[in-house]
Each structure stands twice: as structure tokens, then as C-alpha cells.
């Protein structure tokens, strides 16, 4: 039986970064898909610590909060930088990813039609810090921090990929980010996952907007 279980809705949402991480690291996991109708009936929602998903099982350990899950996998699978300084930078990057993800989620679920044009116009200022970070690390030819992949790379990659769906030209003025996405997308195990029906058939968001 796989050591990990992801309990989540039938969407990419806040779980695709951890799925990409697990796939790229050669880990197996089980999916428990929760239909919205079942969720709204209440028992599972009431049993969840914060009343929300994802829920993540690692053996006897139950975790909630997607970023806590990513950090846990980072620690257990050696994806948290090579020392404390790199770990601090990985945390900083991941917090930056979360800031932009929250803006994205707000657009998708509360203001898509009225807000998309302004959101896309403002997007370059939110992407620029990641381009800057890449430029400061081996000229942008490696990962976002150091010379080994971290959990923040998977989270950033997911964020960039969903923005390429929202605004296909969003990385045109960011050559390092564009090359970074292409480079990570081509990692053999990750490439296989991204081409799989499990990923391809899973909508990005729960309301059909992307």
C-alpha cells in the first residue's frame, strides 16, 4: 500500500504541486477523491481540523494545509536545501508563491470576469521577483535556490504553469522563468506525470474557470 494518501476534490487546485513532487521523486501515493456533494453533506468537513481539504496521510501522521504538507515532504525527502541558509531561502520563495496563489484563487473564485484584465496587467510585477531570484542563482540555469531541487520549485512550477493557462504570454518577458519551466517540465518522471491522464483530465479549479 502506498505510504501517502491525498484526500482532495477532483481538481488540481492546491494538491498538484505535491503530486508533481511525489511523481518526480518516484514516490507512490493513493488518491481519495471527494465529490463536492459528499463534502457539502458535512461529516468529512466536520472531521477536518480546519474544515477544509487537502488532507494528507503519511502513515500514522495526518496533515492539513497544503504548504505544511509540502514542507513535510521537503524535510522527509531531502528537498529543503542543503543547509539552514538555503532552507530559509526555500521558505521565502514558497511564501512568495503563496502570496501570488492567493491572488490567483481570489480572481478565479470571486472576480474572474470583472478582474481578469487588471490581474493580467499586474502580473509582471508579481512574477519579477522570481525572475530576479533565478538570475541570482547560477545565472538562472539551476533551481530557484541552490543546485538541487526543493519543494518550492514544484510549488513555483505549478503556479507558473497555471498562469500560462490564464495568460499564455505571461512569461514572454521573463526568459529565465520561461526556460526554468521548460527545464523542469522535461524532467523524465515529471514529464511522464504531466502527460498522464491523471493530470491531463483533472481540471485546474473547481468552478471551471482557468
From Swiss-Prot:
EC number of the protein: 2.5.1.18
BP GO annotations: glutathione derivative biosynthetic process; glutathione metabolic process; hepoxilin biosynthetic process; prostaglandin metabolic process
Residues modified to Phosphotyrosine: 4
Catalytic reaction(s) noted: RX + glutathione = an S-substituted glutathione + a halide anion + H(+); prostaglandin J2 + glutathione = prostaglandin J2-S-(R)-glutathione; prostaglandin J2 + glutathione = prostaglandin J2-S-(S)-glutathione; prostaglandin A2 + glutathione = prostaglandin A2-S-(S)-glutathione
Family as reported in the entry's similarity comment: Belongs to the GST superfamily. Pi family.
Function of the molecule: Conjugation of reduced glutathione to a wide number of exogenous and endogenous hydrophobic electrophiles. Involved in the formation of glutathione conjugates of both prostaglandin A2 (PGA2) and prostaglandin J2 (PGJ2). Participates in the formation of novel hepoxilin regioisomers. Negatively regulates CDK5 activity via p25/p35 translocation to prevent neurodegeneration.
Protein known as: Glutathione S-transferase P
Source organism: Bos taurus
Gene for this chain: GSTP1
